[in-house]
Amino acid sequence: MKVTNVKIKKVDGDKFDRLRAYVDVTLDDCLVIHGLKLMQGEQGMFVAMPSRKMRNEEFKDIVHPICPELRNDITKVVQEKYFALDQEQEAVI
């Protein structure tokens, strides 16, 4: 599967500690996954899959890639798009 479209909604860094953006990803122009999050971790940015809080207060992914290659592709494309938005905004200012 290939990432064919990415939509990013940046969030205010002052209001959210680690959250950088909400993300929607389209795969093969056939499947859209809403509710991904671009997070800042101790070892860099990563994409958190959509999740639901369970009764025991634990979070479970609603959807997630089974193969690491797809997860890496999603992360790479999302980060590239996020940083491209940063550069576009800096050019406008």
Curated annotation (Swiss-Prot):
Example GO BP: sporulation resulting in formation of a cellular spore
Keywords, sorted A to Z: Cell cycle, Cell division, Septation
Coiled-coil stretches noted in the UniProt entry, renumbered to this chain: none
A Pfam family it matches: SpoVG
Function: Could be involved in septation.
Family according to the record: Belongs to the SpoVG family.
Name used for this protein in its record: Putative septation protein SpoVG
